[in-house]
Amino acid sequence: MSIEEIRKFSNEISSKINFDYDLKKSNWFNIGGQTKVYFRPDNLPDLILFLKKFGEKEKIHILGAGSNTLISDEKFDGVVIKLGKNFSNISILPNDVIIAGSACLDKKLSDFALNNGIGGFEFLACIPGTIGGGLKMNAGCFNKEFKDVLVSIQAIDKNGQVFTIPASKVIFKYRSNDLKEDLIFLSASFKGTKKNKEEIENEVLELKKKKDKAQPTKLKTSGSTFKNPIDQTDKKVWKLIKDSVPLDISFGDAHISNKHCNFFVNKNNASFEDMNKLIEFVKISVEKKTGIVLEKEIKILK
């Protein structure tokens, strides 16, 4: 890695670049070591310049809210990019179209839609991530996904080229899409429908009640660990885990939630190795018991 080149570049832009940056507080598991470079672009020109200069040279990982990421305790030999506050702007256009930056929290978009009397975004109140992360994995809950309200995506590639992708050109599947892995999402436009604010608010409250009843809250967890294996069985992944794994199993401080067994929890000071061992133990146990191979929903940064 050309650290000296990046240090020199950091003096040429207004955005902040940190070196040997601790990532532990940047994810919901509260697990992880350092990254050699941590770039938080405050504006698009700085991001374009960085990618044109280093996009092909460096290993790059985009970090959103960290609500779906497990980070290694070893130092990441690359660049972690976390888009700054100017990428979290949100605005409304005619015909009930909303544009949101990819660093915008899902809940912020849901609240904005509610305040403007636009329905269709209620489910986002229950997803604890950013717009960019939601687009990346076609996040969803309660039978609704990002693709259902998406109009278009603005993205940038590792060469610093910015372009717009209509939703109609993207093949979305369960928790995935066919877009190139190295794309960085900048913003997206979404379309909802006019709806009574009280109706929207009631639906949001109802969805939150369902979520809080079924899922752990205010704990160090990254949500669903594995995807539902929809191409192998109709059974939900939590049911497969419950039937295949002793739920009191733990590795260090890495435990299975007693509220939802597809949620793994750092009870105190679990290491990456602890959590990764738990994930692999569950994966192997389910395969041995059922023959079904689980795929991780959480992202691993190492």
UniProtKB/Swiss-Prot annotation:
What Gene3D superfamilies does the database record attribute to this sequence?
A: 3.30.465.10, UDP-N-acetylenolpyruvoylglucosamine reductase, C-terminal domain, Uridine Diphospho-n-acetylenolpyruvylglucosamine Reductase, domain 2
- Keywords in alphabetical order, please: Cell cycle, Cell division, Cell shape, Cell wall biogenesis/degradation, Cytoplasm, FAD, Flavoprotein, NADP, Oxidoreductase, Peptidoglycan synthesis
Active site location: R175, S224 (proton donor), E297
E.C. code: 1.3.1.98
InterPro entries linked to this entry: FAD-bd_PCMH, FAD-bd_PCMH-like_sf, FAD-bd_PCMH_sub1, FAD-bd_PCMH_sub2, MurB, MurB_C, MurB_C_sf, Oxid_FAD_bind_N
What are its GO cellular component terms?
Answer: cytosol
Domain of life, source organism: Bacteria
**Compartments where found:** Cytoplasm
One GO MF annotation is:
FAD binding
Listed under GO biological process in this entry are: cell division; cell wall organization; peptidoglycan biosynthetic process; regulation of cell shape
Which pathway? Cell wall biogenesis; peptidoglycan biosynthesis
Q: Which cofactor does it need?
A: FAD
**Biological role:** Cell wall formation.
Family (UniProt): Belongs to the MurB family.
Q: What is this protein called?
A: UDP-N-acetylenolpyruvoylglucosamine reductase
Q: Which organism is it from?
A: Pelagibacter ubique (strain HTCC1062)
Q: Which gene is transcribed and translated to give this protein?
A: murB
